Amino acid sequence: MSKQLRQSTKKTKRRLYRGVIHIQTSYNNTIITVTNIKGDVMCWSSAGSSGLKGKRKSTAYAAKLAAANAARKAIRDFSLREAKVLITGPGPARETAIHEIYKAGIKLTVIREKSTVPHNGCRPPKRRRI
């Protein structure tokens, strides 16, 4: 009559002192993802998940909120201390997001531009007439 022990289903907190922060900016939204060195996603945040909707998601303030939330989660849950930053996209709030991550206390080792530039590839959409 041995008792069966229950295993805890709680996730163990992993310590992640070094990581990669991906900043993906577009004209409509900013998405910030924190990964480990291998590329496994640890946490993420976006302007939409920070509580903003519609036109406000495309502002620099929205990117600032998203970056602060992602950095806070990374420090709190994984004790992230230093990170590479990879930036993708043409959005308006790239520097704001980087500055907010730096202000949160994460040491930035590398800042790399990863945006793709077409060599006159696809035809752009027609101009809007309002």
Swiss-Prot record:
One GO MF term attached to the UniProt entry: rRNA binding
UniProt KW Chloroplast keyword: yes
Entry keywords, A to Z: Chloroplast, Plastid, Ribonucleoprotein, Ribosomal protein, RNA-binding, rRNA-binding
GO annotation, cellular component aspect: chloroplast; ribonucleoprotein complex; ribosome
SUPFAM superfamilies linked: Translational machinery components
Subunit annotation: Part of the 30S ribosomal subunit.
Family: Belongs to the universal ribosomal protein uS11 family.
Protein name (Swiss-Prot/TrEMBL): Small ribosomal subunit protein uS11c
Gene name of this polypeptide: rps11
